[in-house]
Amino acid sequence: MIYLDYSANTPVDEAVLQRFCEVERNCPGNANSRHAAGTAAKAAIDAATQSIARSLNVQPAEIIYTSGASEANNFAIKSIARLERHHGRHIISTPLEHSSVSGSLTALQEQGYEIDLVDIRQDGTVDLAHLKELLRPDTILVAVTAVDSELGVVQPVAEIAEMLKACPHCHFHVDATQAVGKLPVSFAGIDTISLTAHKFYGLNGIGVLVKRRGLTLEPLIHGGESTTIYRSGTPTVALACSLALALEKAVSELPARVEHIRALNARLRTGLAQYPKVRINSPDTAVPQILNLSVQNVKGTVFQRELDARGVCVSVKSACSSDGLPSRAVFAVSHDRRNALSSWRISLSHLTTEQEITDFMQAFDACYNALTQ
């Protein structure tokens, strides 16, 4: 099998898995309990929180553990909207967002909130001039993905944060799910940031919402004591510790990982350019881990099935929104419905080998010739 769907899920790093097992075996106590086992568990999760904060260059008090980025996105967006409704009900986002963001906004729209989507430029980035036009005194939230999951476009997060300084009641939420582990990230000027471990070789079921100190959110879960007032319940110490290690490795090993991936991406672009019916949708400025393309007049789902039959795993749209509709992200950039329907995504890793790229190109060639005759 040739796995080229790392933006959907990454295999857990062996050291991360070992850390999880070690903590799970050695810390059986509840971190909320007032005895030796509970104290040991609390010390372990406190150390993990400190490590995560260092890796992200934020404060430990700003870390809220979640089950993943989808929960973090829902939590941040809905909580900010409810708590700021006395200032306004206007929210701005983009057509490039993950379904956990767009779905949260749809739910709020049904409750009377007004949602505007900012225009996307030809290179896939947010049109900052249009964003400035959309901002109003009653705008309470701007929600933007740092890196689009389908095209790999890097959004001008710092510029947006600077623009929003003039809007005292407008909060800024950034979905950093596809950014962490792919490029250096800065969270300056951002109110809430979501991320999840399974995108950077951690385990499924654990994520983080970074909440700027001083920002009030409505608790997601009410109940007993926990590591935070925002999400009550017994913390999963081993998952937190495993996320901390995965994040530490993702940050420290980033330069070497990216250098290898960039070379693979360049090789793919060169090889795919030889096929006249191939259109590369990811701009040259996209993160090298993501390469989106279309084969003219061949639905992405059809090409994906053909590759799957040959042992190659790729994605059509986000793994969380494979509903048979054209890619909103690709359509936003190309304004071509057929091209959006034909699009699919290759996502690379530092684990991807040169031989896998060779084998992929052979499988692609066979599928291309079979489907474009």
Q: What are these regions, as identified by a protein language model?
A:
Residues 1-373:
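Pyridoxal 5′-phosphate
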